[in-house]
Amino acid sequence: MTTKDCGNHGGGGGGGTASRICGVIIGFIIIVLITIFLVWIILQPTKPRFILQDATVYAFNLSQPNLLTSNFQITIASRNRNSRIGIYYDRLHVYATYRNQQITLRTAIPPTYQGHKEDNVWSPFVYGNSVPIAPFNAVALGDEQNRGFVTLIIRADGRVRWKVGTLITGKYHLHVRCQAFINLADKAAGVHVGENAVKYMLINKCSVNV
């Protein structure tokens, strides 16, 4: 409903009353928006910190013609560094890429709320079966496998909302990028957690953009 609509509502003498009511509503909305803006500026929310703690490799096989089968379980930790602002994580998906090419399916992390100075730890599986790899990436990946070290990027994309007191903001895009250096040649570099599974401790700080 616009101010013009409010002025014409009801016709005759009722129009003035409707205009006043509409003016009060618009004024209230403006006050609320100004309040949110001022609170936002004063508190200055800080984006969360993410750390890739470890990766357990169950499978990582490159076969012809340029098909990659991989299966990981990763542990990723998030910390809300704000002392007065909570964070809602919405629609967060984790997956792996190699040289900007997605090599696993996206794994959804359940929506969650993170309070002030709180930590959350997730351990999702990310996997892909016979995923076609670009020929030039397959060559580079084969070279890395021959050297024993493979560099992947673990990504988390989603949306967050900030909670300031009883106020909750709109949704903001969240992009997390974590480098994973995996020593596939030396099994002793990790911990055997199964017949063919090796857990590698990483403790890598991730880049975060909101």
UniProtKB/Swiss-Prot annotation:
Compartment(s) where it occurs, according to its Swiss-Prot or TrEMBL record: Cell membrane
Q: What induces it?
A: Slightly up-regulated by spermine (Spm).
Q: Where are the transmembrane segments?
A: 23-43
Write the gene name.
Answer: NHL12
* A cellular component annotation (GO) from this entry: plasma membrane
The annotated topology with respect to the bilayer is: Single-pass membrane protein
Q: What is this protein called?
A: NDR1/HIN1-like protein 12
Q: Provide the glycosylation site positions.
A: N61
Q: Which InterPro entries match?
A: LEA_2, NDR1-like
* Organism encoding this protein: Arabidopsis thaliana (Mouse-ear cress)
